[in-house]
Amino acid sequence: MTDDLLKSADERLTPINERLSLLSRRRGLTFGTDSYLLAAFVRANPSGDAVELGGGTGVVSLLCLAREKFARILSAEIQPEYADLIRRNAALNGLGDRLTAWEGDVRSLTVDVTGGEVRAVFSNPPYLPMSAGFTNDSDEMNTARREENGTIRDFAAAASRLLCWGGLFTVVYRPDRLTELFTALRDARLEPKKMLLVHPTPASPPSLVLVEAKKGAGEGIRIARPLFIYPDRPGGAYTADMQAVYDDFSLAHLF
């Protein structure tokens, strides 16, 4: 059964939870903490549609749909191999009628593609500038993590084009680029309204930041208490707060 689902030896099938399984590429994008936290942080609108910018394997959209956060999601992905994975993962999990992959550049994504404005856009965008020295042996990973096909400004501008007035853009990003993120959001008329910093341990600096921005909103931001994933060392038991995220699929208890 598993072999029938895999197109090549470079693919694998991984159970995500009791509801979902994920087809992925062995040397490509994997399901990580950032994906789960983004899906948990996204505010639900069960009767509405949403757009994901940079879908990868589709795991964030799949998690949101499995928890009935949205009625339908369009996931934009520039890499053909991953757009194909999104379609196959949607079909595999019985969500083919609710998750659509759009293969293309987010810089050219407009409401003509989505069929109108939406109330929610979310993204785990590339976070390494082209000037960064780090490169990966995998071209797929470079495309996903480096700003080869759009900067955070481009992703914020795309979100703003697609959102109705008062719509929400939710993003997971690197804390060391928080200034650039906030500048990009405000230049796109997206006002940061909620923020949460994620630390591997209480003794570690933050490794992720989650931000919810609202189109056309006034100033004022709510900052959550920090989320510590592990109490002392990475790889051990989760903190009570992190376990609550997995149990409840929500970060509301931190605000």
Specify the residue positions occupied by each region the protein language model found.
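General small-molecule cofactor/ligand-binding pocket signal
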Residues: 23, 100-102, 193-196
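Residue-level signal for inorganic ion chemistry
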Residues: 38, 124, 155, 213
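A generic structural signal for alpha->beta connector loops
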Residues: 19, 47, 70, 96-98, ...
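Conserved Class I SAM-dependent methyltransferase catalytic core
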Residues: 31, 148-206
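Conserved SAM/SAH cofactor-binding pocket of Class I
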Residues: 40-134
